[in-house]
């Protein structure tokens, strides 16, 4: 392969790959920070599965989904609208996974109402999601401008 073709291929995959790696790292950190207190509890869906297995699979699914969505959102010209949409989508996805972990590892073994599940998930997730979503979105936008 000649150098120009290698350079074109690398420049084509550099942005999506960077977005995917950052989303993977920040999502894994968020799941462990928010729901790490449930890592010693048994999963109701898979008695042999570790917390890491669940977190890793959720992170992989999130990385693929969010990478596609964030690449699509990168075509939006209004940076304010783009950042707001990225934050809302990221917060929604992370809260959803945190809720799934809470239900799987805590409330499935007890008698929580839906409202209580949401409130406890919010309690555990608020600080990690608030901090990491802002850091993630601004880091991604900063790096995307540089690429």
Task: Report each predicted region and the residues it spans.
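Alpha-helical membrane-associated segments of multi-pass integral membrane proteins
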Residues: 12-19, 108-147
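N-terminal signal-anchor transmembrane alpha-helix
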Residues: 2-54, 59-61
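Aromatic-anchored segments of alpha-helical transmembrane domains
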Residues: 22-32, 88-101
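Membrane-embedded alpha-helical segments of multi-pass membrane proteins
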Residues: 60-65, 127-131
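Loop-to-transmembrane helix junctions at the membrane interface
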Residues: 67-97
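Alpha-helical transmembrane segments in multipass membrane proteins, preferentially the mid-helix core
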Residues: 61-76, 136-141
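Membrane-interfacial segments
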Residues: 33-38, 42, 76-81, 104-105, ...
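Interfacial non-cytosolic loop connecting adjacent transmembrane helices
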Residues: 35-60, 96-126
């Amino acid at each position: 392969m000649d150098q120009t073709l290698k350079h074109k291929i690398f420049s084509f995959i550099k942005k999506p790959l960077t977005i995917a790696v950052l989303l993977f790292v920040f999502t894994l950190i968020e799941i462990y920070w928010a729901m790490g207190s449930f890592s010693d509890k048994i999963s109701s869906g898979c008695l042999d599965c570790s917390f890491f297995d669940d977190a890793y699979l959720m992170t992989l699914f999130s990385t693929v989904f969010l990478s596609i969505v964030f690449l699509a959102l990168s075509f939006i010209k209004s940076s304010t609208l783009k950042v707001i949409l990225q934050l809302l989508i990221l917060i929604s996805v992370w809260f959803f996974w945190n809720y799934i972990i809470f239900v799987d590892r805590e409330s499935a073994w007890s008698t929580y109402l839906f409202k209580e599940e949401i409130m406890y998930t919010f309690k555990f997730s608020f600080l990690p999601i608030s901090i990491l979503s802002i850091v993630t979105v601004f880091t991604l936008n900063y790096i995307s401008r540089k690429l």
